[in-house]
Amino acid sequence: SSSLTPGHIKSDLEQLSNHYVREIPVTELFPIRDRNYSGSTSTLNILNLAYYPSERGPYNFNPNIDVNGHLTNPTGTWGGMMRKLDTNDFQTANIEYIEFWMLDPFIYSNRLPNANQYGGDFYINLGEVSEDVLKDGKKFYESGMPVDGSHSWTTTQWGKIPTQSTITYAFATSKGSRAKQDVGFNGLTDEEEQQFASYQNFLTAARANTNQAVFDSIWADPANDDYHYFRGSDWDAKQASILERYKRINNPQGNSPDNDNNNERYDTSYKTTPDVEDINQDYTLNEYEKYYQYHISIRPQDLVVGQNFIVDKRVASAPLRKGGSEPVTWYQFRIPLEEFQKRVGNISDFTSIRFMRIFLTGFAKPIVLRFGTFDLV
């Protein structure tokens, strides 16, 4: 909470006490940690994974949606992210485990009669994973999109791809150029998406299946890749919740606005560099899928010490903004690297682990995973 916090959130002590958005003090998870050492903070930096399995993610053109625009088979969908790793030779670095502390994700749903419907699966991939986000065998980078009206691009089933060679990942600085380049991984503006040939089957299905208000929102951004900062006068006007405000924070189109494209009095950019299909910034497109896969069951009945890679748990007293406290449980997972669920592709050791990919699938209901730590040890 600060002077920048919208009034409707600042006064909503119930929401600020919700275990899946509240600040978490260091002492909740680490009660004996020394708070006096240099650089210490009073709250933990939490990795939050909010997954809404019935909602379309960016570039999801599945036509099987209901009248509200929700996917009709949520357990068959997935959501994930991937990152480069700075340490690649695990054997030399003596890295033997994936280790993390996770807050019980079923604090509220366990009180419901359909509690068993809230579980699913969490997967971790370590090794080589494809950087080709929109799979077409071509590297997309926003800064390659032309700003001079030239035709230095080609098309794939997803959209436009720049054809000029990569020199650097930096936006053009001429007036009006940002709107032409900060367009997301498909290289298309919203208006171009509305007319793009391979999107028409989806748009036809959406028009037939949804009500008018839902279709209007789909039509406004067919690829569903538009970015929205977590602050915004429109968010404030509708009194959006904390979780809702972050639903579009990772979308690529418009996430690096310049002053010409910012309608607020404050900076709304998520980043200042172009989105590229090159996670480790080596100017090449890695298309290999060679990795070890690890599986963790995220179900109430499987959160048991001694099973499912859980080695410890901690019941803590969580202070609440509305007053008082509630007991919550944190679980420590420690996954031996040698105990992978399966091996994909030609990988035989842990000497060149360049990427990590994590994803959730098999969920029927929304879920928020909160990680107090996430380490390779």
Where are these regions (language model features)?
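Interaction/scaffold regions that mediate signaling and macromolecular assembly across diverse proteins
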Residues: 2-95, 101-377
